[in-house]
Amino acid sequence: MAKLVEPNAVEVFEMIDAALKYDPSVTKGKEGVYEFHLKGDDGGTFQMIIDEEGPRAIQGTEKEPQCTLEMNTDVFRSLVAGTLNPTSAFMGGKLKVKGNMGLALKLQTVLNSFSF
C-alpha cells in the first residue's frame, strides 16, 4: 500500500491562502497579523494577514506580527488537519505563543474552517 505524501509547509500555506481568498468571511472579526515560525526540514517563517487588503497567507514577512506562533512543522500540519487541539498543543509545550493571546484564540476558528 502506497504511503500518502503530506504537503510541505509552503504547500499548506498556499492552500490556506487559496481558502482565505475563496471564503474571506471566515476571517471576519479576526483582523491581525499572525506569524508562524515553523521548525523542521520544510520549516520557515510564514504569515497569515487579515486586514483591509483582504486575508492572505504568505511565506516570509510582510508586516509586523501581532501574534507569533512557534512550533514544529508536524505540529502545524496536525493543527491545520484538525487532529491536534491548539489548547492541548500549547499546554503540552508543542506550541509557543508570543504577543496577543486573544488573536491566537481567534485563529483557532479560522484554522477549523479549513478541511485539508
Annotated model-derived regions:
Residues 1-116:
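Feature captures hydrophobic
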